[in-house]
Amino acid sequence: SIMVILAGVAIFLILKGLPAITANWETNHDLAGYQNKNWGSFWNYVAPLLWGSLWSSLIALVLGAPVAIGIALFISHYAPRKLAGPLAYVVDLLAAVPSIVFGLWGVIVMRPFLTPLAQFLNEYLGWIPLFRGPVSSTGSTMLAGGVVLAVMILPIITALTREIFLQTPRLNEEAALALGATRWEMIRLAVFPYARSGMISAILLGLGRALGETMAIALIISPSILFSFAVLTDGYNSQTIAGNIANNFPIATDMQRSALIGTGLMLFVVSLAVNMLARGIIGRSTNRTRKAPKIGKRA
């Protein structure tokens, strides 16, 4: 079953990562000065990597979640049936695109495209810490990585949110319209309150997808293992756990591989917690949907 597989993965990560987690990083030959820095302990090493994963995922959610919810709302309540079906299919099809393709698209298209925007943001909004320079001339920024991640999580958030919107009882919608509400007022007063928990769970599942992304981020940004809020600079971007593993695992010694697997364990725990929270919210939303009265089918 799924629980057996998860338990097996967790046991593997714990057994392989425990030597580096419990090791003395100041005296161990392979860990002292690993990646050109004296970390002192495993936790000092994993903290900036975990921050990089969370920071890039947060940027993706801020950029992608509103767009995904807007697309879902358009498909479910505004688009004609002849347009809604093909549009939903195209959005769902994005989920089948490999990560490496998104990464190449980010390198070839998005990095040059976003460079003028980065210069504009730095020139006029540089007083905000997020947009401080120096601006990258190559486009290898966290902004570019966040945009690509936003596109990658778009299908899952859109699909789940669309289904939640479509499950809104018609009785609620028709009651709002009967009271004289416009279509937008009906959506705001009847659909959004009903779908709130479902939208939150969809966003959390998108977060889980973004946390584990590897190749796209590894190709696009020029990262370092540090705490940074910068989104426009080159070389001062926080490295992600997945990207760090992909870049360093092939050349690592046994103890260094243990350290990398240990960081993977931390990512596994965070991703599992996020997905369990999302599933719990979805389960609560599903139970409420079953209890709600339904009248007819949606036109």
Language-model region placement:
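Periplasmic/extracellular loop-to-transmembrane helix junction in inner-membrane transport proteins
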Residues: 13-62, 80, 135, 247-258, ...
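Transmembrane alpha-helices
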Residues: 93, 97, 157-164, 168, ...
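Hydrophobic alpha-helical transmembrane segments of multipass integral membrane proteins
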Residues: 47, 51, 55-63, 67, ...
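Interhelical loop and adjacent transmembrane-helix boundary motif
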Residues: 134, 217-268
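Membrane-interfacial helix termini and adjacent extracytoplasmic/periplasmic loops
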Residues: 22-47, 102-151, 221-222, 232-235
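N-terminal signal-anchor/first transmembrane alpha helix
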Residues: 1-11
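Transmembrane-helix boundary motif in ABC transporter permease subunits
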Residues: 60-91, 278-287
